[in-house]
Each structure stands twice: as structure tokens, then as C-alpha cells.
């Protein structure tokens, strides 16, 4: 796996909840490229629980949406916005776990619409949450601005 350098790190005003390394309230994700997949290894924290020692479903959705955005960024060399996200919660995630792993890849491309599949695994490599995200992507010229 190859670590992806965050191109916005150090940019004034950059405070993304998903990936800004200095956003104390954020989830501060980091990403790696592994073949066709984008991967993130993330440490659950107690402040993100919904129920006692259980990772909040909304935080799980944030993690899945964010990794899908990085698939668009890295694999298509552009940016976009989420237009639809279907999420399936299969198993709870313990906030005391040492880590979770997220993996995402492109399923389909139709012009500027990209379908991305993402999975969230617990420390035992069990699929806990799955998402299919539909992204509306921007032309590269617009994304650079």
C-alpha cells in the first residue's frame, strides 16, 4: 500500500471534518492506495459513540462517504459531490477496538456520474457496514479551481 499525500494539508481555511489533520472535532482520516482500492485505517474514539462503546452510525456514514470522495480524487483526478448514498449496517463497531479498515473502489462510471462501493471492516476483518455512493464529478478544469 502506498500512502496518499493530502494535497490540502497546510492550506489556510482547510478544515474538512473527514480528512483535515488539524480538525480536533473531525475524524482525521488518512488514505492509502492499494491497487484499484483506496484504503483507510482509522482508530475509533469514545467521543464518536452513539450507544455505550458503539460507534455512531452517522460517523460510520461519514467515514464511508469520505473514502468514496478520495476514490474520485485519486482514481479520476477530479472532485465531485455525493448525490446519493445507500448504507447497510450489518454489525456494530466497538469504539474500544484498536482500529477499523475501510476499502472503496469504483463500480461503474457513466459520463460524470461515478458509482463507488465502500466497506467498513472491524479489527477482526468482518464487514460491519457497506455503502454504495453515487458521485456527481466535476470536469478537471473546474476541480482545479
Give the ranges of each region predicted by the language model.
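HotDog/MaoC-like acyl-thioester-processing domains
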Residues: 1-8, 94-96, 105-145
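Residue-level recognition of well-ordered beta-strand positions that form the cores
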Residues: 41-43, 86-88, 103-105, 119, ...
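Hydrophobic core residues within well-ordered beta-strands of beta-rich domains
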Residues: 36, 81-83, 100, 114, ...
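A conserved, well-ordered hydrophobic junction motif at loop->secondary-structure transitions
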Residues: 39-65
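N-terminal short leaders/motifs
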Residues: 57-77, 117-118
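Non-catalytic linker/capping segments at the edges of enzyme domains
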Residues: 1-47
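Hydrophobic beta-strand-centered segment that forms part of the acyl-chain substrate-binding groove
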Residues: 67-101, 106
Amino acid at each position: 500500500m502506498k500512502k496518499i499525500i493530502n494535497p490540502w494539508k497546510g492550506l489556510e481555511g482547510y478544515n474538512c471534518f473527514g480528512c483535515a489533520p488539524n480538525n480536533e472535532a473531525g475524524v482525521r482520516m488518512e488514505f492509502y492506495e492499494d491497487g484499484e482500492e483506496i484504503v483507510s485505517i482509522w482508530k475509533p474514539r469514545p467521543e464518536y459513540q452513539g450507544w455505550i462503546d458503539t460507534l455512531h452510525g452517522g460517523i460510520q456514514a461519514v467515514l464511508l462517504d469520505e473514502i468514496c470522495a478520495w476514490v474520485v480524487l485519486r482514481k479520476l483526478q477530479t472532485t465531485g459531490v455525493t448525490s446519493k448514498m445507500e448504507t447497510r449496517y450489518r454489525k456494530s463497531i466497538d469504539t474500544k477496538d484498536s482500529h477499523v479498515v475501510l476499502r472503496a473502489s469504483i463500480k461503474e462510471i457513466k459520463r460524470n456520474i461515478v458509482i463507488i462501493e465502500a466497506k467498513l471492516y472491524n479489527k477482526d476483518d468482518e464487514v460491519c457496514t457497506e455503502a454504495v455512493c453515487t458521485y456527481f464529478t466535476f470536469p478537471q478544469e473546474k476541480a482545479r479551481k
